[in-house]
């Protein structure tokens, strides 16, 4: 490429350093893209693809976007998974000798967005790094827009699902990873890519190496040991965090001083919620529409600030298990709930506070604007009133918040004295600095103002001297100041006028006097713009030294905002303060579903009681027809427990919650086609996770276990699950089913209790009463529900005929007596021999064989097919 033009050679030299990024190459007022980058951007952004001479035989494909409008275009590209390298002109064009110097100042990726226009204000934008070794996983993730940085490791009971679950909680926008075993077994990364749609990036192995990673963290925090940060020497989070810092250095190309703290945590210090539970309980978004409205977050979010909204989301995604911390939150909510006037005052102040966390990030980044600093000043002005209000409330939490909220008086004063209230968005266009802040700025502005007055006086003088009443003196950036004369008055133009430009309707002229005045005006304006810019940078750097204080205040305001939100919701919806304890009991009186009752008419929602423990009522078997409300009730219990453990009041008239370490849910039927799993396979995989990981302190929600297979297989599995849970786990379990045979287990297996949803029959119609009561029901009302769903009448009539026929032929499945079950368990031993139960289950297999023979169409069966069927039947009977 010896024939390339100098500019294009410069482009290629820079592009070679960023082969995986779209290079936005600054040329004047535009960012230009060339060759393959141009073709990609043209397609993705739907902009015109043109060409440019580059020294080669063919023109270089090219497209471009205006630099002042680039943000929206970059957002579209990054949202589609592209990296964008921003290449700026790094020297003044007027002082450049030859080609102006250019260099990449930042690489923008999905996980490194900082522009608030591109971010959800109430959701963190995380970049995650994962290190997979043969001993476990290390995770580190950061939101560079706020400075939040976290690290953890997974070492005990290592399973990829634990990694998936933690990723499901954090939901990063971008993932860096290195898995030691990936070449031997790519299963883990395959699982991640199939499960999530965020941008994944296999990163350099050496950046995860122990010593390199350790030094990256030490260098950033300027420490000699990581123990003070919360890491033990072999913590796998070190490897992940070290690679994360290296990636940030190479893409952001600046010190990220607002990332000044790392939160090293254990995944066991909060309630564990696997990815299925988060989805099934619709904690932050609904299953169908993926929207916040209709989720628990949508109900609880009365926050007024962006920081508060993000903190609320974090609390919902990671409920507490420490009753001391939970009760402190609940006490704070109680005190705020009682202070009606103060809550209103807080709301008025909170809603006027800017996003201080992301503002601190922009200050550190150097991307803060004059208007941002005005927003900071205005936000700080409301802090004294918030502090005064909190000082009126007794309580440890509020005393702590008062200590943490720093009004930053000197920062407020600095901005008030230095930055104009109506300052422009850009820091490079002047009009920023307050009068009286800097003597030279004032003098230059006066000179510029006087110059404009001279222009007005000159315009009036030239009109008189020339006799041209329409004469005007105008200005543009290309020609500067000029005298404009219309075509009809050209004969009156004085001879000393110098023609500058001819247009269709007028001529433009200059005079020596005009050029002299122009020189004074423009010289003063250029100087003041440059000086104001430097003064703005000076103010910004002074504030940058207070970033830690701004972040501390932001966190305190966020916590206050969430507590306010909880208090407001409790007051509006008659939520009560739950009693949190370390017992193994859950007692809820007149509990209500927090989302459903607010979505529909509050008065029409039917409350229900719940009692569960680890001994006498650990397994609640719930029967009732479809649409009766079984799933709503079970989700309701789970949500009330979760709300209590994040420190929120709950929808009930009374609630006593023993701390729950995990919530499991197996709800609904959905094929996981992307991973080649059927409905039943998904169901069994989720069930295996529950049976393997539930504890006596877990809450388990099981909806229709076994319905993804044949009736007898499904019943067998459901029955076995109940036995296993009761014998080995003792978890508090809500188990809804249409297998009415399972209700016979009450009184035969300790802890099993039957409940049903009341239904009222009115002739052929049914009315769902939504009330959960003790006891079982033997009717499913399936045909009545089908009628409500709108099935054709002839189909319903035929279904009723078939049902009557089947009921006549029905053979009861025998549930063994309590003594038989106990004997069966004793005979199991370590070998898990299930012969005791198998005697009863044999009838299931015989019935299945009979059904297979009965359904055989002999007229369509060939001799060869018949022989094969006989062989299979003989084989199945022999195994019984």
Swiss-Prot record:
Keywords attached to this entry: ATP-binding, DNA damage, DNA repair, DNA-binding, Nucleotide-binding
Gene3D superfamilies according to UniProt: 1.10.1420.10, DNA repair protein MutS, domain I, MutS, connector domain, P-loop containing nucleotide triphosphate hydrolases
Keyword DNA-binding part of the UniProt annotation: yes
Name of one Pfam family that matches: MutS_III
GO terms for biological process, alphabetical: mismatch repair
Top-level taxon in the UniProt lineage: Bacteria
Binding site residues for ATP: 624-631
GO cellular component, one term: cytosol
Protein name (record): DNA mismatch repair protein MutS
Organism in which the protein naturally occurs: Alkaliphilus metalliredigens (strain QYMF)
Lineage: Bacteria, Bacillati, Bacillota, Clostridia, Peptostreptococcales
